[in-house]
Amino acid sequence: MIVAFSVAPTVVGDESAEMSEAVAEAVRVVRASGSPNETNSMFTIIEGEWDEVFAVIKEATDAVRAVSPRTSLVIKADIREGVTGQITQKVDSVNRYLEENK
């Protein structure tokens, strides 16, 4: 399964510094998990089995909650049992169609 999620503090003292720092701690948790992942300006995407992915999301959320009593969490999942490599394969497929139809 692939899960795209965004976690951020909604209450911080210095908005610019603390929000980025809290999000960085969440991303650090995801990267340390060893699961395939990517981070962009809106979401962090992680791939793996249900229990392992949601354990990482919980740990990342807890990292943000450590600096904010109120936290926003958005989750979107593509659940396809037994399918791996979708983080890159989906994008590669779209790019292939774009290249073929120039």
Located regions from the model:
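Charge-rich, low-complexity N-terminal segments
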Residues: 1-102
